[in-house]
Amino acid sequence: MAKEHNHLQDVFLNTLRKERIPVSVFLVNGIKLMGRIESFDQFVVLLKGQDQAAQMIFKHAISTISPSREVVLPQRDAEA
């Protein structure tokens, strides 16, 4: 179950990164950050803002990632 959750998370973040989709990242303390996903791993997301400054955000501090446009995820193999 955890592996599947991480798979969906990875696919979503990787799609945002590859398509360079601008995102709003809302932190658990209410702060809103804006930029593009530059990179990510198991624990952090690297967000690059319009001023090209990078911010490393710990995933446990993220509440929501909201893309600026619709995101079409790649189709997974036939699963029920």
From Swiss-Prot:
Origin species: Thiobacillus denitrificans (strain ATCC 25259 / T1)
Its biological purpose: RNA chaperone that binds small regulatory RNA (sRNAs) and mRNAs to facilitate mRNA translational regulation in response to envelope stress, environmental stress and changes in metabolite concentrations. Also binds with high specificity to tRNAs.
Chain ranges of the Sm domain: 10-71
Protein's gene: hfq
Subunit record text: Homohexamer.
Pfam families: Hfq
Species lineage: Bacteria, Pseudomonadati, Pseudomonadota, Betaproteobacteria, Nitrosomonadales
Gene3D superfamilies membership: 2.30.30.100
Protein name (Swiss-Prot/TrEMBL): RNA-binding protein Hfq
A Gene Ontology term for the protein's cellular component: cytosol
Family named by the database record: Belongs to the Hfq family.
A GO molecular function held by the record: RNA binding
GO biological process, one term: regulation of RNA stability
Keywords: RNA-binding, Stress response
InterPro entries referenced in this protein's UniProt entry, alphabetically: Hfq (IPR005001), LSM_dom_sf (IPR010920), Sm (IPR047575)
Transmembrane segments: none
Stored NCBIfam families: Hfq, PRK00395.1
